[in-house]
Each structure stands twice: as C-alpha cells, then as structure tokens.
C-alpha cells in the first residue's frame, strides 16, 4: 500500500486496516517458445519501453524500432511488447521496477531521475487489457512479439512460451522468493478489521492447505511464502495487528 492510499483510507474513516502478505509474483518478459532463449538486461528493457531515452546528453523520443538497435547482442526483431493497461497493478510494478529504477542511472531525466514512469505510446508497447490469456494468444500468433505479465501465466503456459532471463537470472519460484530476480514483487491484501468476516477470509486464504508450498494457490501460479513466514503471517492475522503510517512507509504489515 502506498502512503497516499493509506491516507485516503484514513480520511474516509477506514482506520482499522490489517495488511496481509500472501506470497510473491514476478513480472516476466515472455515470447513464443519457438524463439531461442534470450538474456536481456534491465537497462535494455527500459530502453525498449521508455517514452523518452537519453542520447547525446539529452532526452529524445524513443527512436528504437528493433531490439538490435538497442544492443547488437539482441535479436533483429521489431520491438512489439504486449502488456497491461495503465489501470493495472502489474503496469504500476513495471513502471516502478523498470522505468523508475533504471532512470536513476541517467542524469538526463533531471527532476524525473528515479521517478520516470512514462511508457512509449507509438505502438511498440501495446496495452492488452486485464487479460493475460489474451497476451499469451498474441505471442502464439506473433513469434516476433514479447509479452509482459505475471509469472503464474508463464508457469501454466510453458508448452507455448518461454521467458527472457533478466540480468542473467531466470524467473523461477526460487529466484522470485529470494528477490534475486529483478522483477519480483510481494503480493498483499488489505482488510477492514471492523468486518470480522474479512479476517475469516484471510485465515482461510493463508491456511496450510491453500497457501503453503504445494498448496492450491501454488498450483495456479502463486509463489508461496516460506513455512516460517507463513506461520508468522497466520499469527499476525489472529492478532489482527493494525496497519499504521510507519509500517506503510517501511513496506511492512506488522
């Protein structure tokens, strides 16, 4: 939860918030399995997606139309990336973990250095709704294209697609949970403790049968918490520890 979101809740009388971490996910850059495996750096992905890129000490509209124009080690394929729309939480993650993070390395962004979030709008990046299955079908039909979506859809479609390594690290449950994979993210739900049924829901959702390694949620793509972290989260739900501004700023729930 962002500080701004927490403040909105407070102003609207929603003050008994319980935050629950449910597991992990990773954003993958996927392609048709007929293509050779690819290694791409976070900076190269940034240069493919950003609306403006640094050249000769200044920002220019993104001129890259092929991956090989960014780096000769990359394939001579058109830059066509299907991804989530601006309304998507996955889009927010891409903006944060790719655009904002890499822009820290370029002084050309000035006041936006480390804050830059503008994705190009020249059809190289193609918003594809909130339907990751649609992106998978696009990759099946277009061998040159890439898709950005959650790890769970890669795990359930490995017969059709593969994912690029990011900075030499493969996307897997192990690398995502360890935060070794650069596009890993933690997943949270937030509950209004004034409604006890929401806590009952969280207790069920984080039960061993659903949320542990080998549980039902892992089978549909969620990277689970470690046994130790799961037990700690289960205890946290029982206590219904409230969220506060200090925890929000620290990115914690208890």
Give the predicted meaning of each segment.
Residues 1-254:
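Flexible loop/hinge segments at secondary-structure junctions
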């Amino acid at each position: 939860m962002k500080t701004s979101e927490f403040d909105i809740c407070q102003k609207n009388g929603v003050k008994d918030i319980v935050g629950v971490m449910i597991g992990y996910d990773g954003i993958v850059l996927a392609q048709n399995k007929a293509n050779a495996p690819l290694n791409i750096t976070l900076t190269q992905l940034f240069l493919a997606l950003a609306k403006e890129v640094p050249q000769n000490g200044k920002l220019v509209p993104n001129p890259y139309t092929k991956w090989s124009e960014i780096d000769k080690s990359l394939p001579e394929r058109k830059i066509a990336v299907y991804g989530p729309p601006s309304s998507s939480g996955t889009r927010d993650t891409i903006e944060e973990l790719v655009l904002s993070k890499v822009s820290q390395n370029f002084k050309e962004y000035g006041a936006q250095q480390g804050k830059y979030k503008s994705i190009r709008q020249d059809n190289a990046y193609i918003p594809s709704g909130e339907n990751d299955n649609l992106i998978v079908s696009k990759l099946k039909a277009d061998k040159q294209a890439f898709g950005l979506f959650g790890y769970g859809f890669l795990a359930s479609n490995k017969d059709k697609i593969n994912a690029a390594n990011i900075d030499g690290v493969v996307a897997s449950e192990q690398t995502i949970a360890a935060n070794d994979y650069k596009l890993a993210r933690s997943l949270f739900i937030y509950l209004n403790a004034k409604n006890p049924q929401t806590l009952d829901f969280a207790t069920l959702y984080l039960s061993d049968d659903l949320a542990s390694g080998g549980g039902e949620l892992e089978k549909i793509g969620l990277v689970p918490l470690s046994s130790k972290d799961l037990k700690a989260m289960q205890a946290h739900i029982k206590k219904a520890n409230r969220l506060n501004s200090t925890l929000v700023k620290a990115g914690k729930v208890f």
